[in-house]
Regions:
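Interfacial segments of multi-pass membrane proteins
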Residues: 140-147, 204-221
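Small-residue-rich segments of transmembrane alpha-helices in multi-pass membrane proteins
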Residues: 3-19, 70-86, 132-146, 183-194, ...
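Short helix-boundary/re-entrant hairpin motifs in multi-pass inner-membrane proteins
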Residues: 7, 11, 40-103, 127-130
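Membrane-interface alpha-helices at helix entry/exit sites of multi-pass transporters
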Residues: 1, 66-77, 178-179, 215-226
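Membrane-interfacial helical/loop segments at transmembrane boundaries in membrane proteins
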Residues: 206-211, 275-291
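Predominantly late transmembrane helices and immediately cytosolic-facing juxtamembrane segments
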Residues: 21, 159-175, 182, 218-262, ...
Length: 291
């Protein structure tokens, strides 16, 4: 399934360039102009690569085995990040105008609601973790489509929350199981939930456009609030009592890598939430914070 969906995504990109003519592949991501047909197919290809519901099948675990941290980080988060940035470029080329249609936003909110329900009702940790990350990516797509500055800049904070917050949430869960130390998993979960002083909070002004855009967007906002509430409720399961492995049962090199990963993810996550302008300058982007 993963290979089939990956091939379909690439095929949509190739087909999407046909209406753009001979100059289609030469379009610049920042200043190019593409026809609606190309933008639509690029959005589909982005959704497949980002694993947004219902194009998430290639991300689902094949077994009910225990969580493999490396597999979730490399096989899930890395390709999804590529898909989110492809979404950003597509939005900048004009795809955001297609996304702002009330029907499209309603579909995005409904898919986010379905993902949140799946995360809440997941019976095992592996599916639970997978659907929480899929839901977080869905929030990033919705925020990017509504951003005041469509493009990679508009998706920067939601994508940062997914990458750093989601990564710390995964690593922190293993830290908690090893030592009973809750701070890393808690910080990661709070970043995914979008609380103040985290990059996820800086993406909230984009989502608030659903309230200021007119009454036609209010049902979409209601769907989003319900979906986000369920997703946050699912994140609260992060504080349920884990199966303690015990640090003495784990190799010393593994525990050292967990500690290093927690610091490597937690430090930039804290800096990005507290010093957003410094972070956007460091990333080489501008106008990422909503006015």
């Amino acid at each position: 399934e993963a290979r089939i969906l990956s091939m379909l995504g690439a095929l949509f990109l190739l087909i999407g360039l046909l209406p753009a003519g001979a100059a289609g592949p030469a379009q610049e991501f920042a200043t190019g102009t593409l026809p609606p047909e190309t933008l639509f197919l690029m959005l589909i290809a982005s959704a497949i690569r980002a694993g947004v519901y219902p194009f998430h099948l290639w991300l689902l675990p094949r077994t009910r085995s225990k969580l493999n941290l490396s597999e979730r980080l490399l096989d899930h988060m890395a390709p999804v990040l590529c898909g989110l940035w492809l979404f950003g470029w597509t939005f900048q080329l004009g795809g955001a105008a297609l996304t702002l249609a009330p029907l499209v936003l309603t579909l995005l909110a409904l898919t986010l609601l379905a993902t949140a329900i799946a995360a809440w009702t997941a019976e095992d940790q592996l599916h639970y973790v997978t659907f929480v990350l899929i839901g977080s990516a869905g929030v990033a797509v919705l925020a990017g489509g509504l951003a005041h500055n469509p493009g990679p800049s508009g998706m920067f904070w939601a994508t940062t929350a997914f990458a750093l917050g989601g990564g710390l949430w995964l690593v922190g869960d293993q830290v908690w199981r090893a030592w009973g130390w809750q701070l890393p998993v808690s910080f990661g979960a709070l970043a995914l939930a979008g609380v103040p002083f985290t990059p996820g909070f800086l993406a909230q002004p984009s989502l608030s456009r659903l309230l200021s855009g007119g009454i036609v967007y209010w049902p979409v906002f209601l769907l989003y609030v319900i979906a986000q509430g369920i997703l946050i409720a699912a994140l609260l399961r992060s504080w349920s009592t884990p199966e303690q492995a015990g640090a003495q049962d784990l190799p010393q090199s593994y525990t050292a890598r967990l500690m290093f990963a927690s610091l490597a993810l937690g430090l930039p996550l804290a800096i990005s939430g507290i010093l957003p302008h410094f972070t956007e300058t460091l990333a080489g982007l501008s106008n990422t914070v909503a006015p």
